Design a protein with these regions (language model features):
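Periplasmic/extracellular loop-to-transmembrane helix junction in inner-membrane transport proteins
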Residues: 49-58, 78, 82, 86, ...
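Transmembrane-helix boundary motif in ABC transporter permease subunits
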Residues: 76-83, 149-179
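Short cytoplasmic-facing helical segments at TM-TM junctions of multi-pass membrane proteins
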Residues: 173-177, 217-262, 286, 290
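Transmembrane alpha-helices
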Residues: 207-211, 244-277, 304, 309, ...
């Protein structure tokens, strides 16, 4: 074999995905994560509880199953390369999660440091999921319907408001003072009026969510239209473009990055308004579920709903950024998630 062929073979081996996976598998972080979850399961089952808690054995079994799955992924890392890379990258986070779960377990169920029933152990949350999954699933469905309906209306209204404000000085003459005066008013401040004016709690909640979405989307869209370089319009006009073309092909595409920033900012406010509206007036959804759980001192259900909300709304935000990355292909920078 010539020197050139040998160098080419070595270079190919260095960039081979199989070689990279083998090098990566030399690090035992995933084994550490599996061990942490296995030990956490031992603590859950073998350390006596200060009182009787249902689902203790079930929780320990689930922890051991998860530990076994981590080991399976590590052993079959060649066949599960994509999953292995993701879990390997998050291995220390999984270790930290197992440690936090054990601390929660010990402080609440094993030593009784946290008063019951206000701070139930993890198996209390698991018991709530198993016993009340139907009500919880209905609450998730109701919250998502209200959220997407309200955010959709608010985003459309905000986009049209911001676009017309930035594009037309005549429109901006009237809308800018309105935005500056009423936009910063919290949507939750209008709950007493909304619950009286609107015929149903759903329509009132949708209006509040839409209102919380409208202001940031309108302001960011207005900013995006106003910040478009005038030279873009000049070049298009030189080529014979009409006002309609300038709006649809120049102004709106240039505004899209600002629009998605506005949607990101609006989503957080819309979620907050959604939960408050459900707790105070809307007779369905996760906010209503939280209020119900607190009223009946079902704190396992309450913490379970909080965990679901964290995962669910984080997923909704991730979906927004997934759409943004598909729409704004090739554009780097901006808000990261």
């Amino acid at each position: 074999m010539s020197n050139h062929s040998a160098i080419e073979t070595i270079s190919t081996a260095e960039i081979s995905p199989i070689k990279r996976a083998s090098t990566l598998s030399a690090n035992p972080e995933l084994i550490y994560a599996a061990g942490a979850w296995a030990v956490s399961g031992v603590i859950t089952l073998l350390w006596p509880n200060t009182q009787e808690f249902e689902r203790t054995t079930d929780l320990a079994v689930l922890q051991w199953i998860f530990a076994a799955l981590l080991l399976v992924v590590h052993v079959f890392r060649g066949q599960l390369a994509g999953l292995f890379r993701k879990l390997h990258y998050n291995a220390w986070r999984l270790v930290a999660l197992a440690v936090l779960l054990s601390i929660w377990q010990v402080a609440s169920a094993k030593l009784g440091l946290w008063p019951q029933p206000y701070f139930p152990p993890p198996q209390g949350v698991l018991d709530a999921y198993i016993k009340d999954y139907v009500r919880l699933a209905d609450s998730i469905r109701a919250s998502l319907i209200l959220l997407f309906f309200g955010v959709g209306l608010g985003a459309l209204a905000g986009f049209l408001t911001g676009l017309s404000t930035g594009w037309s000085p005549r429109v901006g003459y009237w809308t800018i003072p309105f935005l500056r005066l009423f936009g910063p008013v919290p949507a939750t401040a209008l709950i007493p009026i909304v619950l009286f004016v609107f015929p149903t709690s759903f329509s009132g909640g949708a209006f509040l969510v839409a209102l919380a979405t409208w202001f940031p989307v309108a302001v960011l869209t207005w900013s995006g239209v106003s910040s478009v370089d005038s030279s873009y319009y000049d070049v298009a006009r030189t080529l014979g473009a009409k006002e309609r073309f300038l709006l649809l092909k120049v102004a709106i595409p240039a505004t899209l990055p600002h629009l998605f920033v506005g949607l990101f900012m609006a989503l957080g406010g819309a979620i907050s308004v959604l939960v408050v509206a459900e707790m105070l007036g809307v007779k369905a959804g996760l906010g209503f579920y939280l209020d119900w759980a607190q009223g009946w001192a079902a704190y396992g259900h309450l913490y379970g709903a909080l965990i679901v909300m964290a995962v669910l709304f984080s997923g909704v935000t991730t979906l927004l950024f997934f759409v943004r990355d598909r729409v704004l292909v090739g554009q780097s920078g901006g808000v990261q998630w």
